[in-house]
Amino acid sequence: DGEVNRIRGIAKKYQSLRIIPVAINALKGSVFTKNSKIKPTSWKDLRAFRIGLRKGAKYAEYGTTGMKVIAAATNKMVFRMLDRNRIDVAISTALEGSNTIRILGLKGISMVEQPLVTLELFHFLHVKHETLIARITISLEAMAREGRIQNIRNKASEERHSN
């Protein structure tokens, strides 16, 4: 039992999870918009806009606390709202947002070049598996040193782009 590709702070909310302290991936929290004049460089720059995000995208939920947010069940729903001008900006990872635009065949939506945030992602195990953390950490540290984690990420990215 556990979670994969989660931000470090998630254990504050889910206290039964324990982090494996080796980053296995990273996400770039990015802004997508139809208005080329919108170029936020921080979360607070979004305060004036109607913001769409996917429910459960914790980094986006935390970053937009107190703002005008519409949370949808899927990225497809978020980007359809943006396409129909129901929101001014969509928050998504660079990869997921770009893939959603491509899959839906949307035109006129672009990603702001500078991500709002780049976060390392980690494995988490349920507390009942806590005794495994030290061994898994050693294995992941070796994989990181040898470049194997990066190779796995590169291969996964290539496979996503070829589909």
Predicted stretch roles:
Residues 1, 18-19, 44-45, 75-95, ...:
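Short helices/loops that flank or line small-molecule/ion binding pockets
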Residues 1-45, 56-59, 113-116:
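Acidic, polar ligand-binding/catalytic clefts
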Residues 4-15, 89-110, 114-117:
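A ligand-binding cleft/hinge motif common to bilobed small-molecule-binding domains
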Residues 9, 58, 77-78, 96-97, ...:
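Alpha-helix capping/helix-boundary segments
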Residues 25-30, 102-141, 160-163:
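Periplasmic-binding protein-like
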Residues 35-40, 47-50, 55, 123-160:
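Extended ligand-binding regions for polar small-molecule ligands
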Residues 41, 50-65, 94:
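Secondary-structure junction motif
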Residues 67-81, 111-114:
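Short beta-strand-to-loop elements that line the ligand-binding cleft
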